[in-house]
């Protein structure tokens, strides 16, 4: 942690190593810490030299920070509606000296295109809430509920705003749950974001998939490539080699 900018890290927060470029991230275990889905999305998304990328619902900024480490993108923006999470993301950006490459913005996904403008990004990424509406909510709309359930925005909001902000031929990357694939594809096509690439994620080789990684192309032609399955665990507690590589271990 040498040569890091001095930023405030509160007593309820922690610093987690990201194993990429010596980067670290500030998180609050009492709120919502990033999971494997965000890391896998950062390994699936492609940001080319000179491209600008936007992460919708960035949380503590994990996806922009990892994409900055892994790609040659020109600039990365993270949009987050919860001020506390956005503040942690901004401090992580400063801690890693990434202020010139990453911008964190506090705001609502439903108003994103009005804020950033039409055709303003070549790439949009998102790790959105998976659960529909109020289904399964046991408590008030706290940080964890907002991250997991479509309380403040839904899939339609994300795709509508993404379609406006993507340049023609721009790429949309999302991690979601397989049980919603029919709805996802239907809404993507409705907003002229053509599904182009998909990879199912399996916890074990003999289990059903529990995540799906999707790439869409703004204004693309109809042709979907289904990539080989991504298996997470070789055995309980032991990742497959590809997972270790994605994490940077």
Where on the chain are the PLM-derived regions?
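General small-molecule cofactor/ligand-binding pocket signal
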Residues: 26, 77, 103-105, 196-199
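Residue-level signal for inorganic ion chemistry
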Residues: 41, 127, 158, 216
């Amino acid at each position: 942690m040498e040569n890091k900018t001095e930023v405030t890290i509160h007593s309820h927060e922690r610093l987690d190593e990201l194993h990429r470029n010596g980067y670290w991230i500030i998180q609050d275990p009492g709120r919502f810490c990033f999971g494997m889905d965000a890391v896998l999305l950062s390994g699936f998304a492609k940001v080319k030299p000179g491209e600008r990328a936007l992460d919708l619902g960035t949380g503590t900024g994990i996806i922009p920070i990892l994409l900055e480490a892994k790609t040659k993108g020109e600039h990365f923006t993270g949009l987050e509606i919860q001020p506390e999470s956005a503040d942690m993301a901004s401090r992580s950006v400063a801690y890693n000296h990434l202020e010139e490459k990453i911008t964190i913005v506090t705001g609502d996904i439903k108003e994103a295109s009005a804020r950033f403008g039409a055709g303003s990004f070549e790439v949009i990424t998102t790790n959105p809430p998976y659960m529909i509406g109020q289904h399964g909510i046991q408590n008030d709309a706290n940080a964890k509920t907002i991250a997991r359930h479509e309380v403040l925005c839904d899939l339609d909001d994300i795709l509508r705003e993404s379609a406006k902000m993507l340049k023609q031929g721009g790429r949309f990357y999302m991690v979601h749950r397989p049980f919603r694939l029919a709805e996802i594809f239907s809404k993507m096509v409705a907003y002229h974001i053509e599904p182009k690439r998909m990879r199912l994620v399996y916890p074990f080789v003999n289990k059903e998939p529990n995540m799906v990684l999707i790439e869409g192309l703004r204004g693309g032609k109809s042709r979907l490539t289904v990539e080989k399955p991504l298996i997470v665990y070789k055995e309980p507690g032991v990742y497959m080699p590809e997972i270790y590589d994605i994490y940077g271990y």
